Amino acid sequence: MTARLALVITALFFASCTSESTPPPNGAPAPGQEVASSLSRDTAPDTTADELARLTADNAAFGWELYRELVKDRENLFFSPHSISVALAMTWAGARGNTETEMADALRFSLGQARLHPAFNALDLELASRAEAGGANPPLPFRLNVTNALFGQRDFTFLDPFLDTLAIHYGAGLRLMDFVNEAEQSRVAINSWVADQTEDRIEELIAQGIIDAATRLVLVNAIYFTASWAEPFDEANTRSDPFTLPDGTEINTPTMHGNAAMRYVDAENYEAAEVPYDGQQLAMLLIVPDEGQFAAVESALAASTLAQILDELSVHQVDLSLPKFSFRSLVPAKEPLRSLGMVDAFGGAADLSGMNGTGGLFIQDVVHQGFIAVDEKGTEAAAATAVIVGETSAPPAATLTVDRPFMFAIIDRPTGATLFIGRVVDPSN
């Protein structure tokens, strides 16, 4: 089976508190030109193992708190707390005063400015190395690409220290746009860049009307992930099986069937299994509440409970039945972030003076979009046995039939980074 695609885009829009603007000066760089810091990305950041562990723990805490805000009035959901954290960390580099404090509290940043950005750089570089760990001939080449970019008003001055921080720790350059006179053309150009980064899976991230003449900066983070399972599902075994919705309605949905060694637990009110991807570095954690327990299990999910679930898992030989699913989530993140305490950044009280030296900037909006597709396309993946190294006897058998709503997370095993979080209430939607 191939977990074909998981990709997420986060975009933030920054506006001036005044819509007044002067025409671009003679000799100003042309729209579309990239103005980069003179400094190169640091490929060997000075980060300790403890700092990296704190960062991934903080991001997980933020991710599950944001999850609780996002699932309100939703069925299926897919988003990347990592993508949102990276985009807002780049923003935080320019935040000062109470805006800086509120953002750190909402995002659960426990590292200060001097240590957070090198830690994000170290994590990004660590994730970039994952493609080297795949099998010899997977049905789908492993890809985990994280890309950052800034699009700024061509006649607006951004401070060199701000641009240096983003270049050194995030590899992000500044592409110049003319939001004042060409807002719609700028929107189309940014959407085109996003489409290029996501193999055309996300073509319309920014809707009409979001960018206007007051926009001064658009900051974008993209994550593109595609991989094969370590153990394949046989397409011939896929069949239409029943799946029970929260209201008790039973539908039939294409369901894959396979048997493989994986870490599994049958807990008090849920079952969980960690299904590894090719190379064994990343895995999808399935959390399947018992019948009637979905709300209780979901409401208890947090970084600490996720760690507890992972700690409880042990290797079993699992008969796994998993629905195929594919959906897109458009996540307006502004109000959920407000609910988490990030208030000043979105209005006149914002202090983003670290970006331009004078302030007068605020975040117009935060747009986040994710797409995931899981199916059994492709040929058989290279079998891996890393999960059973050290076992001296056959692991116990277990059966996990995912025939009811479930949550999932895609986790980088060596660092513990939670890259994606989602839930499937209706796999046919």
Say what each PLM segment does.
Residues 2, 9-180, 413, 424:
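Detector for small/aliphatic-rich hydrophobic stretches
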Residues 30, 74, 112-291, 311-396:
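Non-catalytic, conformational "gating/processing" segments within enzyme and secreted inhibitor domains
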Residues 81, 108, 289-291, 323, ...:
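Proline-rich low-complexity regions
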Residues 99-104, 293-297, 329-332, 382, ...:
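Extracytoplasmic/secreted cell-surface and envelope-processing proteins
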Residues 101-107, 233-242, 295-304:
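Short Gly/aromatic-enriched secondary-structure transition segments
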Residues 219, 271-287, 395-429:
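Extended hydrophobic
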Residues 303-306, 337:
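C-terminal, non-catalytic macromolecule-binding modules
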